[in-house]
Amino acid sequence: MATKDTGGGQQKATRSTEEVEEQAQDAQASEDLKERQEKLSDDVDSVLDEIDDVLEENAEDFVRSFVQKGGE
């Protein structure tokens, strides 16, 4: 019986180690996702700023391109 208790204790230690490793991997994955989200957010903001600049310069042309002409 003493052998089984020791084996169970070692198994518990292994499970704890595995749980710690999983938590570390989850934390790293979470950080990677945050970095990726920030980069994508910056990219989207950059594109939107560029669109705003173009619209400010060419607003009239932009609107005309969407106005239907007779029969279209």
UniProtKB/Swiss-Prot annotation:
Role played: Protein modifier that is covalently attached to lysine residues of substrate proteins, thereby targeting them for proteasomal degradation. The tagging system is termed pupylation.
Signal peptide (UniProt feature, chain positions): none
Coiled-coil region(s): 10-60
Species for this entry: Streptomyces coelicolor (strain ATCC BAA-471 / A3(2) / M145)
Domain notes: The N-terminal unstructured half of Pup provides a signal required to initiate unfolding and degradation by the proteasome but is not needed for pupylation, while the C-terminal helical half of Pup interacts with ARC to target proteins to the proteasome.
Basic and acidic residues composition bias: residue spans: 31-42
HAMAP family found in the cross-reference section: Pup
Region annotated Disordered, chain positions: 1-45
Regions crossing the membrane: none
Region annotated ARC ATPase binding, chain positions: 28-66
One GO BP annotation of this record: modification-dependent protein catabolic process
Bias kind Gly residues: ranges: 1-10
Cross-link Isoglutamyl lysine isopeptide (Glu-Lys) (interchain with K-? in acceptor proteins) mapped to chain: 72
Molecular function (Gene Ontology), one example: protein tag activity
Family per record: Belongs to the prokaryotic ubiquitin-like protein family.
The protein's annotated pathway: Protein degradation; proteasomal Pup-dependent pathway
InterPro entries, alphabetized: Ubiquitin-like_Pup
Protein name according to UniProt: Prokaryotic ubiquitin-like protein Pup
Any matching Pfam family: Pup
Top-level taxon in the UniProt lineage: Bacteria
Quaternary data: Strongly interacts with the proteasome-associated ATPase ARC through a hydrophobic interface; the interacting region of Pup lies in its C-terminal half. There is one Pup binding site per ARC hexamer ring.
Lineage: Bacteria, Bacillati, Actinomycetota, Actinomycetes, Kitasatosporales
Keywords tagged on the record: Coiled coil, Isopeptide bond, Ubl conjugation pathway
